[in-house]
């Protein structure tokens, strides 16, 4: 079963660390994300999940805990949503 992961209901419009909770940092707009990509990501410390897709502007509209480069490397390595979900399950439950 695949759970729907909601986007932040109140998107941030400025890349301002003051908008982030403790331990978070802004989404970095210089990360290469292709238009149309859907990325399901996990927090490295906490099991925080978020989605980046074509409907999200490529600026800081939410804050993240995860290491973005680790996340993107994982996405490209596994290649598909199903494989990514399995990889997430393996990381979170091992």
Curated annotation (Swiss-Prot):
GO terms for molecular function: hydrolase activity, acting on ester bonds. The keyword Hydrolase applies. Keywords: Hydrolase. Ubiquitous (at protein level). Highest levels of expression in crystalline style followed by digestive gland and mantle. Optimum temperature is 25 degrees Celsius and activity decreases sharply above 35 degrees Celsius. Homodimer. This is Sulfocarbamoylase-1. It comes from Megangulus venulosus (Japanese bivalve). The lineage of its organism: Eukaryota, Metazoa, Spiralia, Lophotrochozoa, Mollusca.
């Amino acid at each position: 079963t695949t759970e729907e992961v909601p986007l932040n209901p109140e998107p941030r419009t400025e890349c301002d660390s003051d908008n982030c909770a403790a331990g978070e940092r802004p989404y970095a707009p210089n990360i290469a994300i292709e238009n149309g990509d859907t990325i399901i990501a996990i927090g490295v410390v906490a099991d925080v999940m978020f989605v980046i897709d074509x409907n999200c502007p490529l600026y800081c509209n939410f804050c993240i805990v995860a290491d973005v480069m680790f996340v993107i490397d994982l996405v490209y390595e596994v290649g598909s949503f199903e494989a990514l979900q399995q990889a997430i399950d393996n990381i979170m439950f091992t």
